[in-house]
Curated annotation (Swiss-Prot):
Species whose genome carries this gene: Geomys arenarius (Desert pocket gopher)
TM spans (from-to): 33-53, 77-98, 113-133, 178-198, 226-246, 288-308, 320-340, 347-367
Further remarks about this protein from its record: Heme 1 (or BL or b562) is low-potential and absorbs at about 562 nm, and heme 2 (or BH or b566) is high-potential and absorbs at about 566 nm.
Membrane topology listed for this record: Multi-pass membrane protein
Protein name: Cytochrome b
Gene: MT-CYB
Length: 379
């Protein structure tokens, strides 16, 4: 078997990626989230496939088909809640994965990092179109509000919005195409994840010290397969607790009301994992400015490799930058909270200050802290 795993064309690829892969000996639990994201993706594709067998993408029957899945299909309620909460789990792992990349300077592997940003955009798009499918109140109005943001693009605004809608409002054509997008995008994400891994394995993994570890690498199996398996067990325990005890904790009660174009819900807000971006969008009174800020809140990550001023890669030995990093985390939690609040004082000003601080930390304060730390260390 040992010979076959190294000689067989197909087994050889798996061997180089997951068995004999040279890995730094000191990578911590924060490196588990890549494999956990892979698990989440597989889980979402499988549960989604079973849901698609019973779902109908028609405005008249979409809501009742979801009800049918929960009531009449064997374990349909479980599959539906696993899929809905699996998205939340996916984004928790995704944000921790990105946070680890920022903390330990993994963004200096620019190809891997940029494909990661593309994966983030695609995952957000998939989650958005998926949220529209149950055709509840928040589904319908969320789709209306977010697709309307495209009307800020000069000259082609009306044509573009109507093209996305497939008519003059969010209706049957919109739901059908969103279902098609929601079905195909995870497979594109899976293909891009392979490319993400391909580029990562060209350079090898980073480590908490941020220094080359070529002289002391260990094989991925059994060390990190075992470690990843521990992460998988812990994640599944958290996931099953959420699904079986608090399935609706992260959802919106308004989505249990069928979509009604004549009745606007009092507060239209996206799922919790988009609230930080939604808060940044709302913090700017101008529509076009808000959309630019929304896109830049993610695209700003692509600038990190070019704003790295420190002579050290990781934040492990840089207390100033560490402080800024944790302020950034607190700021994002604050933005998430603000995104779920109504647009009224004092939430408006808190959201604006938090949005400014977000961009200020990433674009100005972190690079400045890197330069100051270089001076302090006499480098």
């Amino acid at each position: 078997m040992a010979i076959m795993r190294k000689s067989h064309p197909l087994m050889k690829i798996i061997n180089h990626a997951f068995i004999d892969l040279p890995t730094p000996p000191n990578i911590s639990g924060w490196w588990n989230f890549g494999s956990l994201l892979g698990l989440c993706l597989v889980l979402q594709i499988l549960t989604g496939l079973f849901l698609a067998m019973h779902y109908t993408s028609d405005t008249l029957t979409a809501f009742s088909s979801v009800t049918h899945i929960c009531r009449d299909v064997n374990y349909g309620w479980l599959i539906r809640y696993m899929h809905a909460n699996g998205a939340s789990l996916f984004f928790i792992c995704l944000y921790i994965h990105i946070g680890r990349g920022i903390y330990y300077g993994s963004y200096l592997y620019t190809e891997t990092w940029n494909i990661g940003i593309l994966l983030l955009f695609l995952t957000m798009a998939t989650a958005f179109v998926g949220y529209v499918l149950p055709w509840g109140q928040t589904s319908f109005w969320g789709a209306t509000v977010i697709t309307n943001l495209l009307s800020t693009i000069p000259y082609i605004e009306q044509d573009l919005v109507e093209w996305i809608w497939g008519g003059f409002s969010v209706d049957k054509a919109t739901l059908t195409r969103f279902f098609a997008f929601h079905f195909i995008l995870p497979f594109i994400i899976a293909a891009l994840a392979m490319v993400h891994l391909l580029f990562l394995h060209e350079t090898g993994s980073n480590n908490p010290m941020g220094i080359p570890s070529d002289c002391g690498k260990v094989p991925f199996h059994p060390y990190y397969t075992t470690k990843d398996f521990l992460g998988v067990i812990m994640l599944l325990m958290l996931f099953l607790t959420l699904v079986l005890f608090f399935p609706d904790k992260l959802g919106d009660p308004d989505n249990y009301t069928p979509a009604n174009p004549l009745n606007t819900p009092p507060h239209i807000k996206p799922e919790w994992y988009f609230l930080f971006a939604y808060a940044i969008l709302r913090s700017i009174p101008n529509k076009l400015g808000g959309v630019i800020a929304l896109v830049m809140s993610i695209l700003v990550l692509a600038l990190l490799p070019y704003l790295h001023t420190s002579k050290q890669r990781s934040l492990s030995f840089r207390p100033l930058s560490q402080t800024l990093f944790w302020v950034l985390v607190a700021d994002l939690l604050l933005l998430t909270w603000i995104g779920g609040q109504p647009v009224e004082p004092p939430f408006i000003i808190i959201g604006q200050v938090a949005s400014i601080l977000y961009f200020l930390i990433l674009l100005l304060l972190m690079p400045m802290a890197g330069l100051i730390e270089n001076k302090l260390l006499k480098w």
